[in-house]
Design a protein with these regions (language model features):
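Class I S-adenosyl-L-methionine
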Residues: 1-15, 20-113, 212, 218, ...
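Cofactor-binding loop segments of dinucleotide-utilizing enzymes, especially the Rossmann-like FAD-
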Residues: 37, 143, 195
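A contiguous loop/helix-start segment that scaffolds small-molecule binding in enzyme catalytic cores
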Residues: 3-7, 77-82, 137, 146-250
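Active-site catalytic pocket residues across diverse enzymes, especially alpha/beta-hydrolases
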Residues: 46, 126, 180, 184
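Short hydrophobic alpha-helical segments that form membrane-spanning helices or hydrophobic packing faces
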Residues: 20, 121-125, 176-177
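Short, well-ordered alpha-helical microsegments
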Residues: 39-42, 119, 173-174
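Class I SAM-dependent methyltransferase SAM-binding "motif I" and its flanking Rossmann-like core
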Residues: 89-160, 202-205
Length: 250
């Protein structure tokens, strides 16, 4: 029996945003180990496979990473083809490489199917990460370092002209906005995307100075979110409407 591990990026949530190659991998799996943010609809592509939930979300882990690694080995040698179905992309703020290396150390064949990462969600709502004459680059950064504090990479990016896409930062939103204010960037456009790509997705746009107030005015908001900050957002229709309204009253 051939043993194999395929890491599959399930995308940001909408089941239609998985790749065709990802669907083919799911259909060929003997066992599927899937994350919390994976759409249940994706599991329906394979009625015969063993399906095991190993999700992690908001600090609540059903399994430790070491346990997941061992489960990959166990199921591969017992059944054959294991698909590790991971939210977003397996190699973007995930343990994809760790799982891949661990499987290979046991002589298991491996392959990777990339997925759409949540950092690409701004485009789904017409927020450009780059724009000619405004922003020539974008930076994707996690909000939290290994010490639980705001990451050093994020702190070093606050003054950059690059558009910032901040993942796993909702719990530190106030501290992050204060960093921008300390850098005299209170007017910088900011957008928050919660449950991006899902039917209940909510998008809040504002600026550093008022984004927290706008967020607090929406008490029903719940779910994983990303923070986007940069001048390129000013080209979005939300900001253009505000600008035109301001010009009329000025």
């Amino acid at each position: 029996m051939r043993t194999k591990l395929t890491l599959v990026g399930a995308g940001p949530g909408d089941p239609d945003l998985i790749t065709l190659k990802g669907i083919k991998a799911i259909r060929s799996a003997d066992v599927i180990l899937y994350d919390a943010l994976v759409s249940p609809e994706l599991l329906e592509y394979n009625d015969c496979a063993i399906k095991v939930f190993v999700g992690k979300r908001a600090g609540k882990h059903s399994k430790k990473q070491s346990e997941i690694n061992d489960m990959i080995i166990y199921y591969a040698f017992k059944y054959g083809h294991v698909v590790r179905l991971k939210g977003g992309d397996p190699f973007v703020f995930a343990h994809g490489k760790e799982e891949l290396d661990y499987a290979e150390s046991f002589g298991i064949d491996t392959s990777v199917v990339p997925g759409i990462s949540s950092f690409q969600l701004p485009g789904l709502y017409s927020y450009p990460l780059t724009h000619r004459g405004i922003s020539q680059s974008f930076t994707v950064v996690t909000a939290t370092g290994s010490d639980g504090k705001i990451s050093e990479d994020l702190q070093n990016s606050i003054s950059s002209k690059s558009t910032l896409v901040i993942l796993m930062g909702m719990r530190k939103l106030s501290g992050i906005m204060q960093l921008f204010k300390n850098a005299d960037r209170k007017d910088l456009p900011v957008a928050i995307i919660i449950n991006g790509s899902l039917p209940d997705a909510q998008v809040i746009s504002g600026r550093v100075r008022d984004i927290e107030e706008k967020l607090n005015a929406e008490p029903t908001l719940n779910g994983p979110g990303i923070i986007v900050a940069g001048e390129s957002l000013s080209t979005h229709s939300d900001y253009q409407r505000v600008l035109k309204s301001w010009l009329k009253t000025a």
